[in-house]
Amino acid sequence: MLTDYSVLISESYDGQHKLLTEELKRNGTKVHICGDTEIELEIGAVKYTPDVIVIDCCKLGYKKLLHFREILHEDDIHPIIYNIYTYDDTETIRILLDYDDILHILMPYDAKNVCHYMLDKLKRIPVDPDILRQNIS
């Protein structure tokens, strides 16, 4: 399955980002890597014009993430965040989960499922989010 989609992944995306990168490339998606600061993400968004940006919400920070989300929303870029449950504040988690345009990845995850979830979301195909809860054994 070849796609015309482009994904930007923050380089702080620990461990499994290589599996996700391989799976996305296998499906014909262009994958770019950038730094994990707000300015590096903004530069990557302008330089590569991705359809999706994968972000560690804890590295970027809650307030910067919400500000960055507004910038991405204007450019029709879909943010995908992970490590959301490492926040101690349940109110912060609740607020982040309430945004419909932010996709969430639970850790650990199956790279193949996340890849297909991302591509289906880009194609506007309804997907059961429970697929992301399947852990690698």
Model features per residue range: what roles?
Residues D4, T49, E74-Y82:
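His-Asp phosphorelay/catalytic-motif detector in bacterial-type signaling
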Residues D4-D14, L20-L24, I53:
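Conserved acidic segment of CheY-like receiver
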Residues D14-C34, E38:
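Two-component/phosphorelay signaling modules centered on CheY-like receiver
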Residues G35-V52, L60:
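Acidic, metal-coordinating helix/loop segments flanking the phosphotransfer/catalytic sites
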Residues K63-H67, Y85-H104:
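Alpha4 helix (beta4-alpha4-beta5 surface) of REC/receiver domains from two-component response regulators
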Residues K63-I77:
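Short amphipathic alpha-helix used as the core "switch/output" element in two-component signaling
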Residues E91, Y109-M118:
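C-terminal output helix
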Residues I125-S137:
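CheY-like receiver
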